[in-house]
Amino acid sequence: MSLPVLRPAVAVESSPDGVVTSLPEPGHDAVRRHRLALIARGRPARLAATVAVVLTLVGLNVADHVLGWDTMWLGPVGALALLAFARWQGLTWHQLGLARHTHARGIRWGLGVIAVVAFVYLVGILLPSTRTAFLDVRYHLPPAGALLTAFVMIPVGTILLEEVAFRSVLWGFLSRHARMWQVVVGSSVLFGLWHVLPAMASATGNAAIGSAVSGLGPFAKVAVVGGTVLFTALGGILAGELRRRSGSLFASVGMHWATNALGVLFGVLAWRLAA
């Protein structure tokens, strides 16, 4: 007669956010006590943590666009610091969109979006009426420079920080206070406002934007900034919906890389066609 296999009891806790956490090993006791302590602090403490994240993002934005700090180190350091703070505040990898079981689904969504954006951009540069939208002097680059920008500088210096900040950490904190549609809208509005400072240089850097607002005189910069905030906020809503549907940060990362990095690569082609 075989003896029954005895298994250790598994402790389970449930937070106000509806997340159930299993703690099968004694080594998790410290984590469990910390999370319970955070829950016991209540709504004011969670709200203060959310405000701290927003203020940190303001500081990172100023460091980048006013102080001129190098985003190739600012992006990774900022992303790691935000993730560490989120974990310390009790957010799980699932709440942050980084749970292992969601990776494959998120990557599939991301690759699908990349294919769609590539097709749209290809049509855009082939049509003379829309080709000027790709003629950005910042990306009038040789092929090697364009590849470096698309596959290294944009992912490390831009996408890493922005995705971790808005669709991972801020998303997780907002989900403690609001319904999902409010999380999507709130994070997207803040994502739009994040682009105020870089938008101030867009009127002189992009041929299509510059010609579109040339007749507005002193209001040209206001129009560019307002349009950029609106456009990026709408893009944030789309990226947020991808994040919500897939449950993974990788889906919105795919969209972000496609719109930015493919814009650089197709911009190189557009300049060659224009020549």
Residue ranges and their predicted role:
Residues 41-89, 105, 109, 139-149:
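Alpha-helical transmembrane segments in multi-pass membrane proteins
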Residues 147-275:
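Transmembrane helix-loop-helix hairpins at the membrane interface
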Residues 50, 54, 58, 76-79, ...:
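Alpha-helical transmembrane spans of integral membrane proteins, capturing the lipid-embedded, hydrophobic core
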Residues 5, 93-161, 176, 205-219, ...:
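Juxtamembrane helix-loop-helix connectors linking adjacent transmembrane helices
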Residues 2-41:
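Short, Lys/Arg-rich, polar N-terminal cytosolic tail immediately upstream
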Residues 90-95, 166:
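C-terminal ends of transmembrane helices
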Residues 60-64, 82-90, 121-125, 195, ...:
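Structural signal for membrane-spanning alpha-helices in multi-pass inner-membrane proteins
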